[in-house]
Amino acid sequence: LTERETCPKDCFHWETCYGNNMMFAHRISHKNQNLLQKRIQEDILALNGKKALIRLHVLGDFFNVDYVKFWKFMLLMFPNIAIFGYTANNTKSKIKLSREIATEIKKLTARFNERFAIRFSNDNDDLFSANSYDVEKPQKGISIVCPEQEGKTETCGTCGFCWTGKQRVLFKTH
């Protein structure tokens, strides 16, 4: 998705988004939501039942409650998919839409906790969050620095902490 167009305005990394350094990344418009969702569903159908771990939103974010509910529908329809990612939406945001989106994400996480792992960015009250190393330092048993960024694993895929770990993950600013 397109960063900032779909992100909550109170995102901690509004100015320092790692998308700033991704000039060749594909940005997909969310403006025709029906078309976007149709294409996503077609991509999932093309898996032909093969298992897939989907990393949502390399750029951008959940932009409305209906879009979150679309992912609920995908999880119900396709037991072969699991989803992980991050959101700057937060239940404590001053922005009503951000709170509503975050609440819906929490419902999905509770219902599909083995298959839907969305970490809340910079939420120091939630152990299943992804926080900036600029804001929080590692605390034993509470948070760790991203193992891939520390060179402790070859890739995110060989690690898996973001979708299985029960502690906060801290990312160094890109």
Could you say what each language-model-derived stretch is?
Residues 1-174:
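Class I S-adenosyl-L-methionine
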